[in-house]
Each structure stands twice: as structure tokens, then as C-alpha cells.
């Protein structure tokens, strides 16, 4: 007899992941990402293309925010930020790789790549806030 949990759980998980992705869109993701995901209408390959394009955009934003933040802080803080950023990249990659479950099918792939997009977006915003706070202090 088939385990209904194996069928229902991935569907619920995907719905949750896409709801979370949509809420993240309202914060710092590009308007193009919102439009792309709406147009994807739940088609996995289209969603993956949207996520990939947004991840590239957010990765460029992250690199820019990182450079700008480094330029705005003291030499001592720069060394600490470099260490923190290296460790953060390792954490992001390990965390998102954890979501890639070969038994999870396309759902696991969507979750893994969207994890990278979300974490990259959040880190870019965090670095911008840190830089702004440093200017005020």
C-alpha cells in the first residue's frame, strides 16, 4: 500500500516554499522576478529559469554590497567581514545543498535553488543595512 505522506508532503512543501518565495519577493527581490514567477504558473522548468535569473541578479547585488561595505568600514572590521563572508558562503552552500534530496524529485531542486536565491537576497540586504548603520555610528 502506498504511503499517502510521500505524495501529500512534497505538494504541501512546494506550496509552502512558493508562498515563502512570494513573500520574499515583496521585500528585496526584483519586480521582474515577481512577474516571471507569476508567468511560470507552477511549471517547474519555468520557475527554475526565473529563480536562476534572479539569483544571478542578487549575486551581483551581493558582490556590490560587499565591496561597498568593505569600503565603508575600518581595516579591523574589514578583516572580520572577510572572514564572516567566507563562512557565510560556506553555510549558504551547505544549507541549500541539504535541501537537494535525490528522492525529492523536482521539488527538491526548486527548493535548493530557491534557497540560494533567498539567502543571497537576504545577505545583500543585510550588508546594505550594516553599511548604513556604520555611517550613522
Q: Can you annotate each of these PLM segments?
A:
Residues 2, 22-137:
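N-terminal alpha-helical modules
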Residues 8-20:
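Bacterial N-terminal signal peptides
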Amino acid at each position: 500500500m502506498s504511503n499517502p505522506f510521500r505524495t501529500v508532503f512534497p505538494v504541501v512543501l512546494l506550496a509552502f516554499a512558493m508562498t515563502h518565495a512570494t513573500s520574499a519577493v515583496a521585500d528585496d527581490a526584483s519586480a521582474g522576478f515577481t512577474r516571471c514567477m507569476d508567468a511560470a504558473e507552477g511549471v517547474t522548468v519555468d520557475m527554475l529559469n526565473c529563480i536562476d535569473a534572479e539569483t544571478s541578479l542578487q549575486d551581483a547585488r551581493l558582490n556590490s554590497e560587499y565591496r561597498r561595505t568593505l569600503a565603508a568600514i575600518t581595516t579591523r572590521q574589514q578583516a572580520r567581514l572577510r572572514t564572516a563572508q567566507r563562512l557565510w558562503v560556506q553555510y549558504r552552500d551547505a544549507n541549500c545543498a541539504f535541501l537537494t534530496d535525490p528522492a525529492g524529485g523536482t521539488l527538491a531542486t526548486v527548493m535548493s535553488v530557491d534557497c540560494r536565491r533567498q539567502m543571497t537576497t537576504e545577505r545583500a540586504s543585510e550588508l546594505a543595512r550594516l553599511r548604513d548603520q556604520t555611517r550613522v555610528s
